[in-house]
């Protein structure tokens, strides 16, 4: 337990604080710790000594801005300098120099890294904490229970101790091989007397030893050498006689004890606490005393004198943050540096080498480049919207090195554990194979020094009944002794609380007790949930599965042309926008002197502060990042005031969608199965119009025939394709690009023989005698769906690792996408759907005041999905729209009184009806429902319909990026069937379910064409294409398709020959032919 520094003060912590604290811990502690552990290096003759002064390291200012690093595809880093000293003992000469070790990638203000121009983020990993854990499990016969103790090292390696049904104790060295504990203890250096003196159950231990074979008792308990030989045989499955040697002992020490038994500081602390040991924390490897104490505790567990561990409890888990991951990479790099210096220092005795000559800086660059480029926990930052960036930085992953995999993780591991309360969100997780393996931190959770997850609670004093905020660890104290009141008690005042029966959590169960017995209480209703879930209003009325979908789909919402803040929210929208870094904030109090679209200049006590705005910048996911000034020239601003809104913020609040008028009713089957029909107003008024910026790149390489050239003079291309190129061969800014247009003209040199190999080259040479060009065009063209406006062109020159000059051209194209049929829209409650039809405004159902509905949703999507929160959201949305009001509603308002949500919604509708003089807004006979009029006929619908203003978002699943068609394309080499997917120019593939659908309609000939002629019949499919073009009949094949030939070949590989026989009607002669 830890008392908070700001005792009594309550604020929601910054959402990116987890990442910032981790990186600062790496810079302040991790670097110094690893540099301090760097050993002194001497040559074999001990004439030269090399050492580093780790306490005096320095990090230089970055030589490039973060924004320039993105545009130039560079890494945003700082240079690490460390003083080094070399001593020559013969000449007694001491040299001390500041050496350049390498580049350390820096974290930016968003908690991310820029590596090779790409934003990346390091995800926190949740692992089993190193230590020993005792469990009971069924034996291989699934009849009897055996008791095991699993020792987990700092790197995730496991060693298991077990007591079998015959009460014999074993140590598992692999899944199939095990060794008896007396042999292991003797190999580690203990004799029988030391074993019996340091155990709590010496009689029980002797009783177990008597069950061993006689030869084992007598030989291996008294001879360490024989025990080591026996251990070596079991470990490596060696048969025959072995001779003891120190090299064999050293190999056993390095391969087994050093790799499997490295506990680390956290593991040593856990082991001391579990086994009641008093071993210093700097002893990071397991000792014979540890194994003996673990066996002793295992005997106690076997006979009911110990406790079994819950491996899924958070007290047995730890968080490996960005600090730990970067420190591991830094440790590996220093190990490589040590080896390099040792090799270099041997040849440095004769020549006068300085510390700078002994150190190479490429090791750091390569190591960190490999880590950020290929490590599973270094991920491509999802920048669809600001909420996505926040949620990505607060993820917890069970996957990665030392963790689990999607195939091996059990249901128990994926499930929600009671210890997650207030630490890990029980709702927000991935869908699919990674469900339960990728979670999200709760809003108030923080990571402790030892990697444990902490959650704040108010401690209630028994004497004064005062409250102090403390952070609780997920340890035994909380589970065994403390009673924690849930959020229901927040509404009670002091006088009522003492007489109130309160729901609480005690020993991982929920109970109801008197308020006097409460030790802690929750501090906030949002405490248990992640950021995305906390943005869902009326969350308590939704099923958890739909709340999960709503949280995930908020992160898929694209920034809109004109964003709008929600009418019904939760109150966290402001902090989400602020912590995301998408808004520009005044750093100090001052007065705005100058403002334009790019810069905002303010004066503070005569000093000028210039704030740069982000203008049409591309994100990792091709969405548009933009800032709009919100202050005026001459206006006085205060510190922390918003100067410019982002692409998804309005007034400093996160705005991911639009408030549209929705009706829950069926309409001619067009909203069947979650389909959605919308009004054309959403298209023509750019309600759901979004901007996307796509980057196309092309490299200029040095070939064996010479360098490639960027030019406008491209032979054999018509002028229409080259119309947008300038004299340098680059596309001009502001050009409107269509599919197939040339963006960058490039010629690649080739030999004359290569030119003459093409049919057109030989034809020109033979008929006209034209000299064939020695270069072929390799231009960058706009792909299918790549039309748009060119907003930027950048020619980047940089030197690669080999020293060559690498040139790259980047072309940025802005695309304006209106909503259309096939796009996906969703609300915040998991109510998602695809646009099925866009109706004219006059055909849409309209209200009694003549306003047509914007969107018609299927009412059957509410009761079966149990996400009634969308109904509670749209009704105050309608009232707020009529009265120009916004509501910020804290979830779980039922703690105030029963039916609190209903009592909030209906009075607001009544007020709106009174203020606007529209009695139809609130009709007592059916409150919340209204009479709608059919726009096509003017007739009133028979049943009243639920109408409201719902907050709907347009998601990144857009039809422009998914629709695909092909007439001909690539085929698989083995099956000769069309490839799959748009990226491979794949074709239509008829699977088993598609065959069933076609069989249901009885279309036998179409089915045969799709399965054979148009698929894998090589000769006939060419003829079919010609017949379709010319309008001729479809030819009938006379040979088998390729898939049937493949089946025959597979049968032949199994030594099964397939033939068919033809029997003549006249003489009944049998003619066998090979298939």
Curated annotation (Swiss-Prot):
One of the record's GO cellular component terms: mitochondrion
SUPFAM superfamilies: beta and beta-prime subunits of DNA dependent RNA-polymerase
Location of this chain's protein in the cell: Plastid, Chloroplast
A biological process term (GO) from this entry: DNA-templated transcription
Function as written in the Swiss-Prot or TrEMBL entry: DNA-dependent RNA polymerase catalyzes the transcription of DNA into RNA using the four ribonucleoside triphosphates as substrates.
Molecular function via GO: DNA binding; DNA-directed RNA polymerase activity; ribonucleoside binding
Protein family membership: Belongs to the RNA polymerase beta chain family.
Pfam families: RNA_pol_Rpb2_1, RNA_pol_Rpb2_2, RNA_pol_Rpb2_3, RNA_pol_Rpb2_6, RNA_pol_Rpb2_7
Protein name, per record: DNA-directed RNA polymerase subunit beta
Subunit structure: In plastids the minimal PEP RNA polymerase catalytic core is composed of four subunits: alpha, beta, beta', and beta''. When a (nuclear-encoded) sigma factor is associated with the core the holoenzyme is formed, which can initiate transcription.
Residue numbers spanned by region Disordered: 966-986
Annotated keywords: Chloroplast, DNA-directed RNA polymerase, Nucleotidyltransferase, Plastid, Transcription, Transferase
EC code(s) of this entry: 2.7.7.6
PROSITE patterns in the record: RNA_POL_BETA
PANTHER family assigned to the protein according to its UniProt record, in alphabetical order: DNA-DIRECTED RNA POLYMERASE I SUBUNIT 2
Catalytic activity field: RNA(n) + a ribonucleoside 5'-triphosphate = RNA(n+1) + diphosphate
């Amino acid at each position: 337990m830890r008392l908070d520094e700001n005792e009594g003060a309550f604020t929601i912590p910054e959402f990116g604080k987890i990442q910032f604290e981790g990186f600062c811990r790496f810079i302040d502690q991790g670097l110094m710790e690893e540099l301090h552990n760097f050993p002194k290096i001497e040559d074999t003759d001990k004439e030269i000594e090399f050492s580093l002064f780790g306490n005096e390291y320095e990090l230089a200012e970055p030589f490039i801005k973060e924004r320039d690093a993105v545009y130039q595809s560079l890494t945003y880093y700082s240079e690490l300098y460390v003083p080094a000293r070399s001593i020559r003992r013969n000449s007694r000469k001491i040299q001390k120099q500041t050496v350049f070790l390498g580049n350390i990638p820096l974290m930016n203000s968003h908690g991310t890294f820029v590596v090779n121009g790409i934003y990346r983020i390091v995800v926190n990993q949740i692992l089993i904490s190193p230590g020993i854990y005792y469990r009971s499990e069924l034996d291989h016969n699934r009849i009897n229970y055996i008791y095991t103790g699993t020792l987990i090292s700092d790197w995730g390696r496991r060693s298991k101790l077990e007591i079998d049904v015959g009460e014999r104790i074993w140590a598992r060295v692999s899944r199939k091989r095990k060794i008896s504990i007396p042999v292991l203890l003797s190999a580690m250096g203990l004799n029988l007397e030391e074993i019996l003196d340091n155990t709590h159950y010496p009689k029980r231990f002797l009783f177990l030893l008597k069950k061993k074979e006689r030869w084992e008792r007598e030989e291996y308990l008294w001879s360490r050498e024989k025990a080591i030989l026996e251990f070596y045989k079991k470990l490596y499955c060696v048969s025959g006689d072995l001779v003891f040697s120190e090299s064999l002992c050293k190999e056993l020490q390095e391969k087994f004890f050093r790799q499997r038994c490295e506990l680390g500081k956290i593991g040593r602390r856990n082991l001391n606490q579990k086994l009641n040991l008093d071993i210093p924390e700097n002893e990071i490897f397991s000792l014979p005393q540890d194994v003996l104490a673990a066996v002793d505790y295992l005997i106690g567990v076997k006979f009911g004198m110990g406790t079994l561990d819950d491996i899924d409890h958070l007290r047995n888990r730890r968080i490996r943050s960005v600090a730990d991951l970067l420190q591991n990479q830094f440790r590996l790099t220093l190990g490589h540096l040590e080896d390099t210096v040792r090799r270099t220092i041997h040849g440095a005795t004769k020549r006068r080498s300085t510390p700078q000559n002994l150190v190479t800086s490429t090791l750091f660059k390569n190591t960190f480049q490999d880590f950020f480029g290929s490590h599973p926990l270094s991920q491509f930052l999802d920048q669809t919207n600001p909420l996505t960036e926040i949620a990505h930085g607060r993820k917890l992953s069970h996957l990665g090195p030392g963790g689990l995999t999607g195939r091996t993780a059990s249901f128990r591991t994926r499930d929600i554990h009671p210890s997650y309360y207030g630490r890990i969100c029980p709702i927000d997780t991935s869908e699919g194979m990674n469900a339960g393996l990728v979670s999200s931190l709760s809003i108030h959770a923080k990571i402790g020094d030892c990697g444990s997850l902490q959650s704040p609670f108010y401690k209630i004093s028994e004497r004064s009944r005062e409250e102090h905020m403390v952070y609780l660890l997920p340890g035994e104290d909380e589970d065994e002794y403390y009673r924690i009141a849930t959020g229901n008690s927040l509404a009670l005042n002091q006088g009522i609380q003492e007489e109130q029966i309160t729901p609480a959590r005690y020993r991982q169960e929920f109970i109801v007790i008197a308020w006097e017995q409460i030790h802690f209480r929750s501090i906030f209703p949002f405490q248990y949930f992640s950021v995305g879930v906390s943005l869902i209003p009326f969350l308590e009325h939704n099923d958890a599965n739909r709340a999960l979908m709503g949280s995930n789909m908020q992160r898929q919402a694209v920034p809109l042309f004109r964003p709008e803040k929600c009418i019904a929210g939760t109150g966290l929208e402001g902090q989400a926008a602020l912590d995301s870094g998408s808004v520009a904030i005044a750093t100090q109090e001052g007065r705005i002197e100058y403002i334009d679209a790019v810069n905002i200049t303010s004066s503070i006590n005569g000093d000028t502060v210039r704030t740069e705005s982000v203008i049409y910048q591309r994100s990792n996911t091709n969405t548009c990042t933009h800032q709009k000034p919100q202050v005026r020239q001459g206006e006085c601003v205060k510190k922390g005031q918003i100067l410019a809104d982002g692409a998804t913020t309005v007034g400093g609040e996160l705005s991911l969608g639009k408030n549209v008028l929705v009706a829950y009713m069926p309409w001619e089957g067009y909203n069947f199965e979650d389909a959605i029909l919308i009004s054309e107003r959403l298209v023509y008024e750019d309600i759901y119009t979004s901007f996307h910026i796509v980057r196309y790149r092309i490299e200029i390489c040095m070939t064996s025939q010479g360098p490639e050239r960027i030019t406008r003079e491209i032979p054999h291309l018509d002028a229409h394709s080259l119309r947008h190129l300038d004299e340098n061969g680059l596309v001009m800014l502001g050009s409107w690009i269509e599919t197939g247009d040339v963006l960058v003209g490039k010629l690649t040199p080739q030999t004359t023989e290569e030119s003459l190999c093409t049919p057109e080259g030989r034809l020109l040479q033979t008929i006209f005698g034209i000299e064939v060009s020695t270069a072929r065009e390799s231009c960058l063209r706009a792909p299918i769906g790549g039309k748009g406006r060119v907003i930027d062109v950048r020619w980047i020159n940089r030197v690669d690792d080999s020293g060559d000059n690498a040139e790259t051209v980047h072309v940025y194209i802005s695309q304006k996408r209106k909503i259309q049929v096939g796009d996906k829209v969703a609300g915040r409650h998991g109510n998602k759907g695809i646009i099925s039809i866009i109706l004219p405004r006059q055909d849409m159902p309209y209200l009694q005041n003549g306003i047509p509905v914007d969107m018609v949703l299927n009412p059957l999507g509410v009761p079966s999905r149990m996400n009634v929160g969308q109904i509670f959201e749209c009704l105050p949305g309608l009232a707020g729209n009529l009265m120009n009001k916004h509501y910020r509603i804290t979830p779980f308002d039922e703690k105030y009184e029963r039916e609190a949500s209903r009592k909030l919604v209906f009075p607001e509708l009544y007020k709106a009806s009174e203020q606007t003089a529209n009695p139809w807004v609130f009709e007592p006979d059916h409150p919340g429902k209204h009479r709608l009029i059919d726009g096509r006929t003017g007739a009133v619908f028979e049943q009243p319909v639920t109408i409201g203003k719902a907050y709907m978002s347009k998601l990144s699943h857009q039809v422009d990026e998914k629709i695909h068609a092909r007439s001909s394309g690539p085929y698989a080499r083995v099956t000769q069937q069309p490839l799959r997917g748009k990226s491979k120019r794949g074709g239509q593939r008829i699977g088993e379910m598609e065959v069933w659908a076609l069989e249901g309609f009885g279309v036998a000939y179409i089915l045969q064409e799709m399965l054979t002629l148009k698929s894998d019949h090589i000769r006939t499919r060419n003829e079919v294409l010609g017949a379709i073009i010319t309008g001729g009949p479809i030819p009938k094949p006379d040979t088998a398709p390729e898939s049937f030939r493949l089946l025959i070949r597979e049968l032949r590989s199994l030594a099964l020959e397939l033939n068919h026989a033809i029997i003549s009607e006249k003489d009944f002669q049998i003619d066998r032919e090979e298939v």
